[in-house]
Amino acid sequence: MAKVYYEKDVTVNVLKEKKVAIIGYGSQGHAHAQNLRDNGFDVVVGLRKGKSWDKAKEDGFSVYTVAEAAKKADVVMILLPDELQPEVYEAEIAPNLQAGNSLVFAHGFNVHFDQVKPPVNVDVFLVAPKGPGHLVRRTFVEGGAVPALFAVYQDATGVATEKALSYADGIGATRAGVLETTFKEETETDLFGEQAVLCGGVTALVKAGFETLVDAGYQPELAYFECLHELKLIVDLMYEGGLENMRYSVSDTAQWGDFVSGPRVVTEDTKKAMDTVLAEIQDGTFARGWIAEHKAGRPNFHATNEKENEHEIEVVGRKLREMMPFVQPRVKAGVK
């Protein structure tokens, strides 16, 4: 079982006298920066010119270029998309790191897969809240917190663990609990969850269910409701209390169908396929493929995205959601 740390375990905050640079001011960046500042940390924000720069200035932060922020800081937290981090790190962060500095991440992908290679004289750790930035900020303001993971990759100073816990405490995570892990474990489990269950697995299951009903002659609108729209109701129940809560809350007919039909859909062959997915994450096959795809301009990514967006379930869903303004997305989907 994971070791969990709480506020009582952070007896001395070793970062309170240090300057922290938050690189990026998106979902996680704004939450980390504001929570740390509210807890008395000296925070600057490092960005390239754009809307985020203006937003960070409006929120009262001193904003610098990434290179300037990294040079000023003792602690550099990189909160940029995975695929952008290596270039920004090499060009703007690495040249400005000093011995004893801390290089911090919220996801271990680039360090674990050798896309970012820190110098041996800096501490390297991650602090990863298990929730989106708006929730990290909102719960903090309300006096609560989102749990987080932390891991130490490199301890150059002998106090990297203390620094990681101090950072986690600064964003409020120790109120809920901070679980100790490794860069390897955090990276591989995160990627597996996305691919086999949360994104890849769920979308494939939803489409397969929809197609099965439509191919059998049922109206696509009903197939959409039964296989996609109502998924939120079930996921919310699981989110609140696990599978047990979901099964308690649905009808007995639905629960019996769960017991007798679920294992026939997700079979031992499915688990074997999951094993293959995990193996490709572990041996770097997935990472190499994604890095190559990004460097090539993402031709397959964009082509697949365009094709998926025109699947019948999407066409039907757009029409049905016009009947339900209460489910309109907060952010309009578009080209990444």
Swiss-Prot record:
Substrate binds at S251. Its EC number is 1.1.1.86. Mg(2+) 2 binds at D190, E226, E230. NADP(+) binds at Y25, G26, S27, Q28, R48, S52, D82, E83, L84, Q85, G133. Pfam families: KARI_C, KARI_N. Keywords: Amino-acid biosynthesis, Branched-chain amino acid biosynthesis, Magnesium, Metal-binding, NADP, Oxidoreductase. Its cofactor is Mg(2+). GO terms for biological process: isoleucine biosynthetic process; L-valine biosynthetic process. Binds 2 magnesium ions per subunit. It comes from the Bacteria. It catalyses: (2R)-2,3-dihydroxy-3-methylbutanoate + NADP(+) = (2S)-2-acetolactate + NADPH + H(+); (2R,3R)-2,3-dihydroxy-3-methylpentanoate + NADP(+) = (S)-2-ethyl-2-hydroxy-3-oxobutanoate + NADPH + H(+). Pathway: Amino-acid biosynthesis; L-isoleucine biosynthesis; L-isoleucine from 2-oxobutanoate: step 2/4; Amino-acid biosynthesis; L-valine biosynthesis; L-valine from pyruvate: step 2/4. It is an enzyme of class 1 (oxidoreductase). Residues 182-327 form the KARI C-terminal knotted domain. GO terms for molecular function: ketol-acid reductoisomerase activity; magnesium ion binding; NADP binding. Residues 2-181 form the KARI N-terminal Rossmann domain. Mg(2+) 1 binds at D190, E194. The active site is at H107. GO terms for cellular component: cytosol. Belongs to the ketol-acid reductoisomerase family. Involved in the biosynthesis of branched-chain amino acids (BCAA). Catalyzes an alkyl-migration followed by a ketol-acid reduction of (S)-2-acetolactate (S2AL) to yield (R)-2,3-dihydroxy-isovalerate. In the isomerase reaction, S2AL is rearranged via a Mg-dependent methyl migration to produce 3-hydroxy-3-methyl-2-ketobutyrate (HMKB). In the reductase reaction, this 2-ketoacid undergoes a metal-dependent reduction by NADPH to yield (R)-2,3-dihydroxy-isovalerate. HAMAP family: IlvC. This is Ketol-acid reductoisomerase (NADP(+)) 1. It comes from Bacillus thuringiensis subsp. konkukian (strain 97-27). The lineage of its organism: Bacteria, Bacillati, Bacillota, Bacilli, Bacillales.
